[in-house]
């Protein structure tokens, strides 16, 4: 599903995944719950092909187009899209973990993820230990014999702490664990964790990828093997995105490389001015000491 390697990132954002039906420049919105069961589609379904167009809970033209674009942006082998970021996270956890398994995650993890790990997964016999996102040694100290996943965020939501991804990957590889990163607050514009050895990248596409506060969505990117497992969960749990949201998301992703430099510049300037304001007690921003750590390798590819 990846776009040609000779395309620059901004070009991939615009062109990867677009389905030019009827010579259209953009992927049209396919408001169809069901597709005709041709012999070719039946053969694909019987062979277990993920992106066979039969029923929109399984796959749709619009969800496939968005998945291909996100896959190209993150440099993955395959991707799946979801109705929300939490649908992506919960489906991933439920398909990769079993009763008796253990996760190490950040104490600063997104609130919805924290609730999943501390309230819902324990009911299924899956335990989580919270560690310091800025201290890989605290993650390593929390690892148990039954640990299966190290879960991190590139930049924590909402406290904006920056994670040393290469160092976390080293910890994961030493213990033969999956390393999963929520890359929502960095976006592929700033960081492409798969290139650093991460196993799966998760997004709430509601945020920077969508970019206009008018959609809800999620995505997971990684190897074909892992995405195949997660796709099966999406089919069974029903967290598939609707075509209109996918169309809006595809539109938003085209302008990611145009939007992010302005967004990051403006937020840094706002943080600087607030820091100088006499009535402001504390400011959290990735350019300020509360967020920054030493990164062992550049996060911008």
PLM features: residue spans?
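Conserved PLP-enzyme active-site core in the AAT-like
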Residues: 2-5, 10-19, 79-277, 284, ...
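Short, basic and Ser/Thr-rich N-terminal targeting/leader segments
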Residues: 24-25, 75, 242
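Flexible glycine/acidic-rich beta-alpha junction loops that bind and position SAM and/or redox cofactors
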Residues: 70, 289-292
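Acidic-residue sensor for enzyme active/binding pockets
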Residues: 74, 153, 297
């Amino acid at each position: 599903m990846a776009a040609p390697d000779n395309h620059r990132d901004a070009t991939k954002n615009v062109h990867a995944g677009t389905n030019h039906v009827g010579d259209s420049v953009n992927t049209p919105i396919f408001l169809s719950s069901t597709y005709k069961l041709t012999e070719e589609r039946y053969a694909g379904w019987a062979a277990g092909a993920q992106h066979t167009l039969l029923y929109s809970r399984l796959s749709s033209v619009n969800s496939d187009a968005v998945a291909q674009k996100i896959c190209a942006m993150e440099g993955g082998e395959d991707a799946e899209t979801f109705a929300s970021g939490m649908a992506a996270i919960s489906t991933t956890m439920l398909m990769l973990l079993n009763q008796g398994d253990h996760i190490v995650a950040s104490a600063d993890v997104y609130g919805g993820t924290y609730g999943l790990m501390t309230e819902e997964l324990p009911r299924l016999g899956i335990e989580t230990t919270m560690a310091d996102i800025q201290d890989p040694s605290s993650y390593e100290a929390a690892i148990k014999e039954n640990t299966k996943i190290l879960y991190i965020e590139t930049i924590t939501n909402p406290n904006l702490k920056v994670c040393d991804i290469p160092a976390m990957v080293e910890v994961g590889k030493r213990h033969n664990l999956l390393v999963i990163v929520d890359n929502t607050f960095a976006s592929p514009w700033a960081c492409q964790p798969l290139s650093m050895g991460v196993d799966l990248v998760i997004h709430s596409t509601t945020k920077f990828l969508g970019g206009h506060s008018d959609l809800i969505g999620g995505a997971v990117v990684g190897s074909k093997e892992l995405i195949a497992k997660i796709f099966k969960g999406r089919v069974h749990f029903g967290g598939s995105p609707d075509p209109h949201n996918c169309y809006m998301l595809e539109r938003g992703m085209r302008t990611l490389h145009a939007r992010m430099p302005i967004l990051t510049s403006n937020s840094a300037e706002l943080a600087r001015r607030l820091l100088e304001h006499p009535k402001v007690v504390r400011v959290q921003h990735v350019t300020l000491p509360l967020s920054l750590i030493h990164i062992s390798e550049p996060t911008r590819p």
